[in-house]
Every structure is written in structure tokens, then in C-alpha cells.
Amino acid sequence: MSRAVAGPEIERLIQLLGRLPGLGPRSARRATLHLIKKRETLMAPLGLALQDVLGKIVECQVCGNVDVRDPCTVCTDIHRDSSVLVVVAEVADLWALERANAINAKYHVLGGVLSPLDGVGPDDLNLTKLVERVGAGGVNEVILALGATVDAQTTAHYVTDLLRETGVKVTRLAHGVPVGGELDHLDEGTLSAAIRARTAL
């Protein structure tokens, strides 16, 4: 066990930062030292921003996104194509698609994927509201952007069956060669998916 090198307040900050995704103990220490070094220009504004947003965060009752308003910024954007609904597993997926600026549609966050091994069943996901949104009319296409894992694909098939009676067009993201990727560096599953999802030029 390593000895403490700073007071309990700093050690607590290190431990809390270490709980963030992608930050282990070493990275948390480096981040803490960086915050301390930049305490006037980074740490203080970060602390204020965290305090400001803490009491305002809400889950959008329409799509499941997180924001400081409900309905969220995405749902209230009148410039979006509300006839297209992109279904994602997590809020992080919604944000990733928005960063890519790939589509100007509305979203629906399931809150995970079906995973029998982890005890996640249909009742644990935001599926009822999805069926209600599609059933209310106005949605012409549902794009399943759920990833390529076995659980994600199982979820995609389940959602497709669930929406079959609505008559809505259901599509999913193509899987395959990433932009800038070289074929000899890809696994067989990715190559097979790329061949199956090929398009005409």
C-alpha cells in the first residue's frame, strides 16, 4: 500500500477522479496535479461548472437524453427531421453521433442493450416509450444505431420485431471497414460485415 503524499482533501480528489472512465490511479494523480497547477484558470471554473450543472441535470422524458431542460435541446430543435428516429443504447452514443454531425434526426435512448448474462431484459430498457413514439405517427424510419456486439444485435432484432406491426421502416447502421482502415489490420468478423454491407458506386 502506497503512503499518502498529500492531505486527505487532495487524496479524495485523486480517488474521485480515478472513478471516471479511462482514468486509473496514475492518470487521476496526473489530472489532479494538472488541476492544482492550473487552479485559477481550470480548477476554479471546473468547480463552478460542476456546482452549476449538478442541480439542473434531468433526463429527457421524450428521448432519454440528459440535459438541463426537459424536453431536451435535441427534442425541441425544430430544424431536425422528426420523421427519422435514431435508436441508440446510451446517451454517449447519441452524443457521438451528434459530434460526427452525421444525421439531422431525433433520437431515442434505450438505456442499454438486452443482456441475459447481465440480467438485462426488455423491461429494463426504454422500449415501451419507443413503441408509443412510433405508434403516435409521424415517424417514417427508425435507424438502429446499437453497435456490433452480440447483445446489441440481439437488441436490434428484438426492436425490429417489436416495431413490425407499426409498419415503420427499420434500418440499421452498416458495419465494416472504418475510414482510414487497412484490410490487413481488420478481423474476420469486420471484413465479413463489410462485404455484406457493400454498396454500389
UniProtKB/Swiss-Prot annotation:
Annotated keywords: DNA damage, DNA recombination, DNA repair, Metal-binding, Zinc, Zinc-finger
Domain of life per record: Bacteria
SUPFAM superfamilies reported for this sequence: Recombination protein RecR
Transmembrane among keywords: no
Domain Toprim: 83-178
Keyword Membrane part of the UniProt annotation: no
Xref: Pfam families: RecR_C (PF21175), RecR_HhH (PF21176), RecR_ZnF (PF02132), Toprim_4 (PF13662)
Any one GO BP annotation for this protein: DNA repair
GO terms, molecular function: DNA binding; zinc ion binding
First and last residues of each zinc finger (C4-type): 60-75
PANTHER family (alphabetical): RECOMBINATION PROTEIN RECR (PTHR30446:SF0)
Family: Belongs to the RecR family.
Described function: May play a role in DNA repair. It seems to be involved in an RecBC-independent recombinational process of DNA repair. It may act with RecF and RecO.
Record's protein name: Recombination protein RecR
